[in-house]
Swiss-Prot record:
NCBIfam families: GroEL, PRK00013.1, PRK12849.1, PRK12850.1, PRK12851.1. The lineage of its organism: Bacteria, Bacillati, Cyanobacteriota, Cyanophyceae, Oscillatoriophycideae. GO terms for biological process: protein refolding. Forms a cylinder of 14 subunits composed of two heptameric rings stacked back-to-back. Interacts with the co-chaperonin GroES. It is found in: Cytoplasm. SUPFAM superfamilies: GroEL apical domain-like, GroEL equatorial domain-like. This is Chaperonin GroEL 2. It comes from Trichodesmium erythraeum (strain IMS101). Keywords: ATP-binding, Chaperone, Cytoplasm, Isomerase, Nucleotide-binding. ATP binds at T29, L30, G31, P32, D86, G87, T88, T89, T90, G413, N479, A480, A481, D495. GO terms for molecular function: ATP binding; ATP-dependent protein folding chaperone; isomerase activity; unfolded protein binding. Its EC number is 5.6.1.7. PROSITE patterns: CHAPERONINS_CPN60 (PS00296). Its main location: cytoplasm. It is an enzyme of class 5 (isomerase).
Length: 544
């Protein structure tokens, strides 16, 4: 395919145009008075969302060069989402502001490589400052505040997440599922999460989120390597007749057997997913036994005289729901409280008997996984469209609270970044020279962008609000919900430090890369040829 090559200023301007389009459509959602965006779907009802990364993933432009700009800035959003699970809109707005400011300097003749070095040094300084200003989370009230802000100022959601964290612990698993009623409810159930994902991405049932969701599945638990599909055929036939999904937990599945499972899954013969067993050696056997107790199944192992080809349905475990991503598996079980408690007691006794601190630590991990359970938030809404929006907001809120527990909280609403701008200017003037100094000042001017946008979405003058916030002390910011200047910690308007840090780092990274671009190579669109006029068919230009 022929390529189109664009150089210098033209290349950067084309990228900028794509970025403008994406940044504007994402920025309208920022802040308590941010609006929603409607996404048209090829199948089903349109989706109404308020989540930056979901909007960014949907935007695809006709012009290949502009589309490259969209992809670059989308990366800032998705990397922030991967690292912190929230703050995607902030990352997009920041990256866009840095690129805009930087391109002005490049057009005026500044050296892009020196600017990039300045941007990187500024980002390093700001990361340290964010860590300095972060406060550790002490109580569930602070957790509720973080959750409420991330869910779009929904205090009920904040309280629910704080309650869930109280019950399953800060490291515990909080899972989301679609509820059957109008109310959003919280339920604590048995379950566990371990850090092994699906063996093949073809097992994913939701291609957009790349995860496999199995409702009321059967679970085959074995500690052997499955090399031949013949070993599995008897079980697969029994499960296919029962019409339920199947999860296979094994040491490994070799290529031939895996290929057969994938083909059967894609053809719809049996809804199956396969996951490698967690842990190593004796710990793997112990963890498989934990999972068997949790799901009411048996570990099919030759140590107990059980063979795969002789496995029956009543040897398989059962669960309410299993969610598998590329990195981890969450099992939501139910109804085995007695057995789970007995197993926990057994692990506690082992902990008392062992002298090895390593073994104690590993037993403690197993106990936490088994005893902690899973908090299930059942999302309720009047319509399916509202349900999907609420689910995305709740997901953001859960991620944000976990990030807040990890690295603490800072004043929210764009306040932290706005207050750090003068500090960065002072530091840069003392420590950097010439174009590196210009690079760091690009960042300092861009730091006000999220606050300005939040104010503009609330109908205020962003530039004026930004300057007024800079004059006040560090914890004072602009509450866009009622247009007042308040102490952000007291008002409960807080952001996780990890979210602010990730958004800043990813924005600086993308901005630096865009500014140093001097040439773009993209595919040239092929001209569409009209169909030749044929007997009775008509040419491509005729109306029928």
């Amino acid at each position: 395919m022929a390529k189109r090559i664009i150089y210098n200023e033209n290349a950067r301007r084309a990228l900028e145009k794509g970025m403008d389009i994406l940044a504007e459509s994402v920025a309208v959602t920022l802040g308590p008075k941010g609006r929603n965006v409607v996404l048209e779907k090829k199948f089903g009802a349109p989706q109404i969302v308020n989540d930056g990364v979901t909007i960014a993933k949907e935007i695809e432009l006709e012009d290949h060069v502009e589309n490259t700009g969209v992809s670059l800035i989308r990366q800032a959003a998705s990397k922030t989402n991967d690292a912190a699970g929230d703050g995607t809109t902030t990352a997009t707005v920041l990256a866009h502001a840095m690129v805009k400011e930087g391109l002005r300097n490049v057009a005026a003749g500044a050296n892009p490589i020196a600017l990039k070095r300045g941007i990187d040094k500024a980002a390093g300084f700001l990361v340290e400052k964010i860590a300095e200003h972060a406060r550790q989370i002490e109580d569930s009230k602070a957790i509720a505040q973080v959750g409420a802000i991330s869910a779009g100022n929904d205090e009920e959601v904040g309280k629910m997440i704080a309650e869930a964290m109280d019950k399953v612990g800060k490291e515990g698993v909080i899972s989301l599922e679609e509820g059957k009623s109008m109310q959003t409810e919280l339920e604590i159930t048995e379950g566990m999460r371990f850090d092994k994902g699906y063996i093949s991405p073809y097992f994913a049932t939701d291609m957009e989120r790349m995860e496999a969701s199995l409702e009321e599945p059967q679970i085959l638990i074995t500690d052997k390597k499955i090399a031949l599909v013949q070993d599995l055929v008897p079980v697969l036939e029994q499960v296919a007749r029962s019409g339920k999904p199947l999860l296979i937990l094994a040491e490994d599945i070799e290529k031939e057997a895996l290929a057969t499972l994938v083909v059967n899954r894609l053809r719809g013969v049996v809804n199956v997913a396969a996951v490698k067993a967690p842990g190593f050696g004796d710990r793997r056997k112990a963890m498989l036994e934990d999972i068997a107790v949790l799901t009411g199944g048996q570990v099919i192992t030759e140590d107990a005289g059980l063979k795969l080809e002789n496995a029956k349905l009543d040897m398989l475990g059962k669960a309410r729901r299993i969610t598998i991503t590329k990195d981890n598996t969450t099992i939501v079980a139910e109804g085995n409280e007695k057995e789970v408690k007995a197993r926990c007691e057994q692990i506690r006794r082992q902990m008392d008997e062992t002298d090895s601190s390593y073994d104690k630590e590993k037993l403690q991990e197993r106990l936490a996984k088994l005893a902690g359970g899973v908090a299930v938030v059942k999302v309720g809404a009047a319509t399916e469209t509202e349900m999907k929006d609420r689910k995305l907001r709740l997901e953001d809120a859960i991620n944000a609270t976990k990030a807040a527990v990890e690295e603490g909280i800072v004043p929210g609403g764009g306040t932290t970044l706005a207050h750090l701008a003068p500090e960065l200017e002072t530091w840069a003037n003392e420590n950097l020279q010439s174009e590196e100094l210009t690079g760091s000042l690009i960042v300092s001017r861009a730091l006000l962008a999220p606050l300005k946008r939040i104010a503009e979405n609330a109908g205020q003058n962003g530039a004026v609000i930004g300057e007024r916030v800079k004059e006040k002390d560090f914890n004072t910011g602009f509450n866009a919900a009622n247009n007042e200047f308040v102490d952000m910690f007291e008002a409960g308007i807080v952001d996780p430090a990890k979210v602010t840090r990730s958004a800043l780092q990813n924005a600086a990274s993308i901005a630096g890369m865009v500014l140093t671009t001097e040439c773009i190579v993209v595919d040239k669109p092929e001209p569409k040829e009209n169909a030749p006029a044929g007997a009775g068919m008509g040419g491509g230009d005729f109306d029928y």
